[in-house]
């Protein structure tokens, strides 16, 4: 072959390679249950050990101001899978039952639904349509079946034979079993791009230790922030599984071709962990109940670092669809695509408002953490954050609370009386949003008994 012919042949080959469509990345999405904002080493825990998560976080982009769309499990997951705020899909609470004593509820609980409607297209369905093999492992919590809403393979934690909570037959541990299932799925996917949604049941109650780790944490000096031995074993079990998953990716040469996303469905379980300096915990709409750990790691694409850009669970839908090169459906989506931010193509997302709507009640665990209300973790409310300011609006009496999160992340200094113009502007923004998305506001409860509520409050405060 002449030199000229060889050069032309090489140019044609290079041109063809450049024109060939790039294979989309695999996606490993690890989503924990009741894992608090401070519960990982990379978020400051001084007792729980998460070396594998910490390593991934150092190599990815960590979002310090990341939020779940709800303060408890089912609505958070419905928002995540649908890309919609709660008023659109109407999964407002865990189950549709009212919480607490009916005589203590001034308003009627908006029932909503416990099932993600079949007409809502999930991001998993979008990925399926784009040629992805999809798998879901762990907690679904949205009724029907994951396989009816976009997952080729589904291993639901409640359907694993012989398991009671986190404990299985012959010493099996749930976090290990779910990790095994995810690894099996990856191995069976061949050359197809895949998305593994590993939705651990950990660290939800019942708090059950991984037995072989107990002695380690019983002998460990307690931290100033965390000291719960059983919780520590549960967290390490998850982290060890993450380490095994990364090792499996490396063995198969998939690490650089796999995006790893990590987050939690809501704040931590108040009686067992601490989100300090945040106030509140799972079930409250203070920062401790809705701010969650979140990072995205994709070697060579996502620039490592930390950002205080506020993001929220509904952002994951357009982000996952974008990462996969898939097509978004013709339905309302409330989030924004984070890929330009992850790639460093934009400096930020602008001062967009983030919203929460909870027209229901969640009964209290008990009196601790100087909580607002000893009877309910949360009463019916809406919340908005725009920039550094966050407004809570309560429907029972129309009360509002306004906080400057940059100066008062613990939400202890209510500015609603000091900044009336800002208060009214944020309240109007919230009312306008409720109108646009059809958010229901609960009506008066005919069973409410003010005297019974007062007696219950007095008993609770006395302990």
Question: Language-model segments: which ranges?
Answer:
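Loop/turn elements at helix/coil->beta-strand transitions in domains of secreted/extracellular proteins
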Residues: 23-28, 59-64, 130-135, 152, ...
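Long, internal low-complexity/basic segments
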Residues: 19-25, 32, 36-37, 62, ...
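Histidine-centered active-site microenvironments of extracellular/periplasmic hydrolases
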Residues: 146-150, 207-209, 247-302, 312, ...
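C-terminal cap/loop subdomain of S1 sulfatases and analogous C-terminal strand-loop tails that border
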Residues: 268-273, 280-285, 302-303, 309, ...
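Active-site segment of extracytoplasmic enzymes that catalyze sulfate/phosphate-ester chemistry
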Residues: 29, 37-121, 126, 132, ...
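Active-site His/acidic residue clusters
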Residues: 159-164, 182-230, 269, 275-276, ...
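A short beta-strand-to-alpha-helix junction
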Residues: 45-50, 67-72, 96-98, 112-121, ...
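A long, amphipathic alpha-helix that forms part
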Residues: 179-186, 215-258
């Amino acid at each position: 072959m002449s030199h000229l012919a060889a050069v032309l042949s090489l140019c044609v080959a290079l041109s063809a390679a450049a024109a060939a469509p790039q294979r989309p990345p695999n996606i490993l999405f690890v989503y924990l249950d009741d894992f608090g904002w401070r519960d990982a080493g990379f978020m400051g825990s001084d007792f729980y050990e998460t070396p594998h998560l910490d390593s991934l976080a150092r190599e990815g982009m960590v979002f310090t101001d990341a939020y779940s769309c709800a303060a408890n499990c089912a609505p958070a997951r419905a928002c995540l899978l649908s890309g919609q705020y709660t008023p659109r899909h109407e999964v407002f609470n865990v189950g549709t039952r009212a919480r607490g004593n009916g005589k203590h509820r001034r308003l009627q609980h908006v029932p909503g639904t416990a099932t993600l409607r079949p007409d809502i297209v999930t991001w998993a369905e979008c990925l399926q349509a784009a040629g992805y093999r999809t798998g879901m492992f762990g907690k679904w919590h949205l009724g029907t079946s994951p396989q009816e809403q976009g997952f080729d393979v589904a291993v639901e934690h409640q359907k694993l034979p012989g398991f009671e909570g986190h404990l299985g037959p012959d010493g099996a541990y749930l976090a290990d079993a779910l990790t095994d299932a995810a690894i099996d799925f990856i191995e069976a996917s061949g050359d197809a791009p895949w998305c593994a949604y590993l939705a651990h049941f950990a660290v939800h109650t019942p708090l059950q230790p991984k037995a072989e780790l107990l002695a380690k944490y019983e002998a460990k000096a307690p931290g100033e922030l965390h000291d719960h031995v059983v919780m520590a074993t549960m967290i390490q079990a998850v982290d060890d599984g993450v380490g095994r998953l990364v090792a499996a990716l490396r063995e198969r040469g998939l690490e650089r071709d796999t995006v790893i996303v990590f987050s939690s469905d809501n704040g931590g379980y108040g009686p067992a962990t601490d989100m300090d300096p945040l106030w509140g915990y799972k079930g409250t709409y203070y920062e401790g109940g809705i701010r969650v750990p979140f990072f995205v790691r994709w070697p060579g694409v996502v620039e490592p670092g930390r950002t205080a850009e506020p993001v929220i669970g509904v952002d994951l839908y357009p982000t996952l669809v974008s990462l996969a090169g898939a097509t978004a459906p013709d339905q309302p989506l409330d989030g924004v695509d984070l890929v330009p931010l992850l790639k460093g193509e934009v400096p930020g997302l602008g001062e967009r408002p983030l919203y929460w709507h909870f027209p229901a009640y969640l009964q209290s665990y008990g009196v601790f953490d100087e909580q607002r209300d000893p009877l309910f973790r949360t009463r019916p409310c809406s919340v908005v954050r725009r920039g550094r300011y966050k407004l809570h609006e309560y429907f029972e009496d129309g009360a509002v609370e306004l906080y400057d999160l940059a100066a008062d992340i613990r939400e202890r200094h209510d500015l609603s009386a000091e900044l009336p113009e800002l208060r009214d502007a944020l309240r109007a923004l919230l009312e306008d949003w409720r109108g646009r998305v059809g958010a229901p506001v609960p009506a008066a409860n005919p069973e409410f008994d003010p005297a019974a509520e007062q007696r219950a409050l007095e008993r609770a405060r006395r302990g």
